[in-house]
């Protein structure tokens, strides 16, 4: 007789990048508890990351309401279940009142900043062996990625947009990186350019899409759900992008990843994994905070990151991952 299912409520982040960085905990729990069944709560933008988990019951998109009623709505959806484990990476009060055998609730700990992967692992007390980000994909998702990337030559994936102008490296510099790496004398000679971004980025990336002949450009901006983007990124030889959810998807996919940083803290948000690099200009995060304390001004903070520095990092990473 098979064992009874072990229901796990997993409450994760609103933002895509944070949700990706916590995703390895589901893989770890699934490996250690074979009869686990997951209900995942995530922000609407990130919820799609968890749709292909093979042993999930529900994915609940969790949209914040100005009056705070979103917590009561979530309570109504989850309160009747007797949970085996509640993992709450938001540290909410709701989790303390649910019926469960065990709880693992995020608590802020004093001390120096630690990476978000380690912070999530600390909630399960596995910070000495943190769970690397991991996303499940269905055979159908993988096949679509195969079809979208069909062709010959290595793929350079670029994600030139970000959720804020301050974190966005100029589009013309991404174009120069593409030319340097994919040129006949470049380390990815004969390769193809893959461009990724959200629906609002379509016009922004147009200059980049014109960098190479059409038959060497795969512009999927605004066309993919998150898991298909993840599956497509598995097929790239190299990823270069701003600090964004796509950067974390690329690193989780195992693709050699270069994250371009300026006014964001790479101690917390560096791409996770051995085949990743952080590239930033001459200023550290604290210097950006000093001139833009709220990190919300309409200022292009990435102007002092030169193309040559990014290309050099790309060449080094390509050599290291041959």
Language-model features, listed with the residues they occupy:
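Catalytic machinery of carbohydrate-active enzymes
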Residues: 1-322
């Amino acid at each position: 007789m098979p064992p009874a299912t072990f229901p796990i409520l997993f409450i994760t982040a609103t933002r895509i990048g944070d949700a990706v960085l916590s995703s390895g905990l589901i893989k770890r729990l699934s490996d250690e508890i074979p009869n686990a069944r997951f209900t995942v709560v995530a922000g609407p933008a990130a919820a799609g990351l968890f749709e292909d988990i093979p042993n999930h019951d529900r994915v609940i998109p969790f949209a914040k309401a100005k009056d705070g009623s979103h917590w009561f709505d979530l309570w109504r959806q989850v309160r009747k279940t007797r949970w085996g484990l509640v993992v709450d990476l938001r540290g909410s009060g709701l989790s303390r009142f649910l019926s469960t055998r065990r709880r693992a609730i995020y608590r802020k700990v004093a001390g120096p900043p630690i990476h978000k992967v380690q912070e999530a692992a600390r909630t399960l007390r596995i910070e000495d062996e943190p769970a690397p980000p991991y996303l499940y994909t269905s055979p159908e998702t993988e096949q679509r990625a195969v079809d979208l990337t069909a062709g010959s030559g290595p793929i350079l994936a670029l994600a030139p947009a970000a959720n804020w102008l301050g974190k966005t490296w100029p589009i013309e510099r991404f174009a120069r990186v593409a030319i340097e790496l994919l040129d006949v004398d470049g380390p990815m000679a004969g390769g193809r350019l893959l461009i990724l971004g959200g629906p609002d980025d379509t016009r922004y990336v147009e200059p980049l899409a014109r960098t190479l002949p059409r038959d060497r450009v795969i512009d999927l901006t605004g066309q993919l759900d998150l898991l298909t983007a993840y599956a497509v990124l598995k097929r790239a030889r190299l990823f270069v992008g701003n600090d964004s959810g796509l950067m974390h998807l690329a690193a989780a996919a195992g693709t050699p990843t270069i994250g371009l940083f300026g006014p964001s803290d790479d101690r917390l948000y560096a791409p996770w994994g051995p085949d990743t690099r952080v590239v930033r200009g001459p200023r550290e995060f604290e210097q950006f905070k000093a001139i833009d304390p709220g990190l919300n001004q309409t200022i292009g903070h990435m102007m002092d990151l030169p193309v040559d520095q990014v290309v050099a990092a790309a060449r080094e990473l390509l050599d290291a991952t041959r």
